[in-house]
Amino acid sequence: MASGLAKRFGSNKLLAEFDRKPLLCRAFAVTEGLHRVVVTRSTEVQALCEECGIPVLHHALPFRSDTVRLGLEYLLPRFPAMSGCVFLPGDQPLLTRKTLCDMISAFCAEPDRKSQIFRLCEPQSGTPGSPVLF
């Protein structure tokens, strides 16, 4: 997910340098080898995705739910056997591949996963956050 409006950060934070690369490149690295698509309102993010060979959908729709819907509309016809989908905001630079894989493994091990929503939680408070998998 890369459809933020950059109101609080002042510029497109996904393009801000993090570890000598645009922040969004961390999400690309964590999701390497997975079926993925970036949904964005930003032409600059679109250009970065195209440069990196990442499928991208550019849109101008107003709601966060539009991002989810567009992503699913892209992925489901291409991967009909998909049993779940991770929604990963592009501004999660500390998310590791191991954490993402552990989340996917837990989801796949859940017998009732069709009715489950998996979210990472802040360890001390248990406050749910991103990414989300359902």
Which sequence ranges carry the predicted segments?
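Conserved beta-strand termini and adjacent loop/short-helix elements that scaffold enzyme active sites
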Residues: 39-41, 57-59, 120-123
